[in-house]
Amino acid sequence: MDKHRTAVAAGHICLDITPVFYGGRGTQMDKILEPGKLIDVGAADIHTGGAVANTGLAMQKLGIDTKLMGKIGDDALGKTILSILESHHAAEGMIVDADATTSYSIVLAIPGIDRMFLHHPGANHTFSYDDLDFAEIAKVDLFHFGYPPIMRNMYVNNGKELVRIFQKVHKSGVLTSLDLAAIDPSSEAAQQNWEEILRQVLPYVDFFVPSIEELCMMIAPETYAKWLERANGSDVTGILSLSDILPLAEKLRSMGARNFLIKCGAPGLYYDMANAEVQQELEEKSGLSCRYQSYAYKRTES
């Protein structure tokens, strides 16, 4: 019988507040959100968001004993997050910082229009290496970290803090995974050298799981601009083919990426598996059989 699996989900957490817009609104945002206009909406959907809650609670529901490590403020929104996590018996590892505010997002999901997010990073911006309990992390099978692009300490100084975290966890023998988030083009995060940040951290990441748009914006911004032009206002993933994705996959491999899964929206997923030597290392770390991994690797090479 397989042993009971354990994990830590760390990084970004927030409260998502989504007002429900009634159908038939049309497709022009400026005709809906007009200055001085009162818009009748339905009840707000309020739930936790961010990698810590989304991935952490999902793993827990899949039967993995998961500890959450995120930071919130000592305020009404923070108390709401704790209440939700407590209902899942998952609040134990959370940090409450009286000097910080809780992160939240207002999600505008208007029928016929792509979603928009108003996001306040709050306590996520102050999350640091020292907030992690590495003694607890060393005991688990998997360490998952999410959304460094909206966590200031993770991207300033050329990503030094993020690299430091992954070096520490990787050295402890725990499997590691990293997820990204979209970047506001006008934000401080957009001014960072993300290609260099990823080049430094990826050798310590066993599983890298970015979206195709996040990835292209970070390591091939000129290509991303061309994609936007081709899409002409529609969903970028709808105009992509395998020939668009392969150059990014090759670049990731040259940057030291091991296993990576690129999320490509409705068209599907692109998975690139590391070589047999790396897979053997992961087997030794995790105790999982590599029979399926070896088969998948041969399929990738063929």
Named regions from a protein language model:
Residues 1-11, 20-21, 163, 167-168, ...:
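Conserved phosphate-binding/catalytic region of the ribokinase-like
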Residues 1-69, 76-87, 112, 287-302:
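Glycine-rich phosphate/adenosyl-contacting loop at the front of the ribokinase-like
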Residues 66, 92, 176-177:
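Hydrophobic beta-strand scaffold residues
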Residues 83-100:
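A glycine-rich helix N-cap at a beta->alpha junction
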Residues 93-97, 107-155:
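Conserved phosphate-binding/catalytic loop of the ribokinase/pfkB sugar-kinase fold
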Residues 150-160, 188, 218-219, 226-228:
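Glycine/threonine-rich flexible loop motifs
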Residues 157-164, 190-199:
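Charged helix-capping and loop-helix junction motifs
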Residues 172-181:
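Short beta-strand/loop segments at the ligand-binding rim of alpha/beta enzyme cores
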